[in-house]
Amino acid sequence: MTLTLRLDPEELMQVFDLYLAACDDIVSEHGGRVMQYMGDGVLAYFGYKQAQASDAANAVRAAIAIRDALGRLLLPAGISLRSRIGVATGLVVVNERAGRGDGRGNGIVGETPHMAARLQTVAKPDMVVVADATRCLAEGPFTYRALGTFRLSGFPTPVTAFEAV
């Protein structure tokens, strides 16, 4: 049963506030920025405005930290949150809203956010799934388990995916 059916609106907002605050804090701590909230989804990016060699590793670290933090949130009795996270690496175009200047704009354009969203659909609960390019750039600090190749909607060739463990 979904949270919207199990919780009254005030409790639901408290859970969402805790979840989104945790995501915001963790992404920021790892050098990233949250671009958009999409329902219970969070779109974050690393390497804006200045790309660093550590961006892919920081993104994977943040994803693992979010997955782990959800189990530690103080939620109403009987409520637990599970995550499915996709991480992809590549070029994007950032669309900032005029005057904001903080990097949270109307969105990002490019193959990379679509890849991350599609990889999320491959993930099982509490799994961080990364694209091969991300794995290659963030190879040292993590252990990966090959998940295989997948035909992802919108991508002409199969995509190789890995679980960050």
Residue spans of the language-model regions?
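Helical mechanochemical/support elements of P-loop NTPase systems and associated helical scaffolds
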Residues: 12, 19, 38, 55, ...
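Conserved long alpha-helical elements within nucleotide-processing catalytic cores of c-di-GMP signaling
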Residues: 1-24, 28, 35-36
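Conserved NTP-handling cores and scaffolds of large molecular machines
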Residues: 4-7, 27, 67-77, 120-127, ...
